[in-house]
Design a protein with these regions (language model features):
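Transmembrane beta-barrel strands of outer-membrane/channel proteins
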Residues: 25-29, 75-79, 137-143, 205-209, ...
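Membrane-embedded beta-strands of outer-membrane beta-barrel proteins
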Residues: 61, 118-120, 137, 189-191, ...
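Outer membrane beta-barrel transmembrane domains
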Residues: 36-45, 210, 214-335
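Short loop/turn motifs that connect adjacent beta-strands in outer-membrane beta-barrel proteins
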Residues: 11-20, 32-35, 70, 126-135, ...
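Residue-level signature of outer-membrane beta-barrel architecture
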Residues: 16, 27-29, 65, 77, ...
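Outer-membrane pore/translocation modules
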Residues: 82-231
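Surface-exposed strand-loop-strand hairpins of Gram-negative outer-membrane beta-barrel proteins
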Residues: 2, 29-58, 177
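Residues that define the transmembrane beta-barrel architecture of outer-membrane proteins
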Residues: 19, 55-59, 102, 110-116, ...
Length: 335
């Protein structure tokens, strides 16, 4: 699954005074190697050593400005560093599962600037009179600044005149799941709400949906101009849970929530054709938040409890690699 939504804030929000700047750095790590078709895990892939392994790091630099205590503007500049390991099969030699025997592996990679985001958000209720509950709505733009067609060398099965395996090097676009950019403009819809239910205990809910009206970015999955064109799909992240400030003087809060993240089969705006891997993961997300004297930090580890590689727009099934867990870290400073 593609990972392009970086680390969100956790727990209850704190209002910023007019003129306040907040800078932050966040990191997301995702190691995907568990294959699913629908919600059925394809354990044969690991057993025969053919699983695809995506290792993705996303570092996000952001700055936000409080236009007023009610209105905020945020600029987010992400950088992605990713590798993808995959197998080479010899179809002349079937293994115990009836597939070609895995005889080699190779790795492709891509890194660089990802897609920049600009977001404006507003608290619906007056912060002065609603210190213990509020709802924020946000609207933004995703800019196609990340490279959509990074290329690397693939190892393709081939033999010499004696029939001995002699891999052929083939330069092509790396897989869509590790491309730094989506290759299209996007519209960002953002929602966040919190409410204090007891002293030092709050509940929260958040959602981000990135709509990409463009059907595809003209990037194919084969050598040269061959193969299928990758679709530009929407993406989403929904979270809900509670936070308990167990050490108020130290500014420490424990959070626990549910998380659903993925990419749909059908976009809400525009066409949905082309090749894509729709699906989602549902996770339990424990976390820890620190906020004191203008500093803030958060760490969470969503652990997957359900994964589903859905059928695409045309009704075709396929597999996708999911992670068992991801790690999210952020550090911020307001001044």
């Amino acid at each position: 699954m593609t990972a392009r939504i970086s680390s969100p804030s956790l727990g209850a929000a704190s209002y910023q005074e007019r003129g306040t700047w907040t800078t932050a750095v966040s990191h997301r790590w995702q190691y995907s190697d568990r294959h699913f078709v629908g919600d059925e895990e394809q354990t044969v892939r690991e057993a025969e050593g053919s699983q695809v392994i995506n290792n993705v790091h996303v570092v996000d630099l952001s700055v936000s400005y409080a236009v007023s205590k009610r209105i905020n503007a945020t600029l987010s500049v992400p950088f992605q560093f990713a590798t993808r390991s995959q197998a080479v099969r010899d179809n002349r030699i079937p293994n115990q599962f009836g597939n070609g025997t895995v005889i080699d592996r190779y790795q492709t990679s891509a890194s660089g600037l990802s897609d920049i985001k600009v977001l404006g958000s507003v608290w619906l209720l007056d912060p002065e009179n609603n210190k213990k509950q509020n709802v924020s709505l946000g609207l933004g733009v995703l800019f196609p600044t990340g490279q959509k067609d990074h290329k690397d060398v693939f190892k393709v099965f081939a033999t010499n005149s004696a029939g001995v395996y002699t891999p052929r090097a083939e330069t092509r676009n790396v897989d869509n799941s590790i491309q730094p950019g989506a290759g299209a403009w996007g519209i960002i819809f953002d929602l966040y709400g919190f409410m204090e239910v007891f002293e030092n205990v709050n509940v929260f809910a958040a959602g981000t949906y990135i709509a990409t009206p463009q059907e595809d970015a003209g990037v194919n999955d084969g050598p040269g101009t061959t193969g299928q064109i990758w679709s530009v799909g929407d993406s989403y992240l929904f979270r809900a849970g509670f936070g308990y400030t167990f050490l108020p003087k130290q500014g420490l809060t424990f959070t626990l929530g549910g998380r659903m993240e993925g990419s749909p089969s059908t976009d809400i705006i525009g066409d949905s054709g082309g090749r894509r891997r729709p699906g989602f993961a549902i996770s339990i997300e424990p976390g820890l938040v620190f906020a004191k004297n203008g500093w803030s930090a958060s760490f969470s580890t969503p652990v997957a409890i359900y994964r589903n590689r859905e059928r695409n727009f045309a009704g075709n099934s396929g597999d996708a690699a999911f992670a068992d867990f991801i790690t999210l870290f952020s550090l911020g400073r307001s001044f």
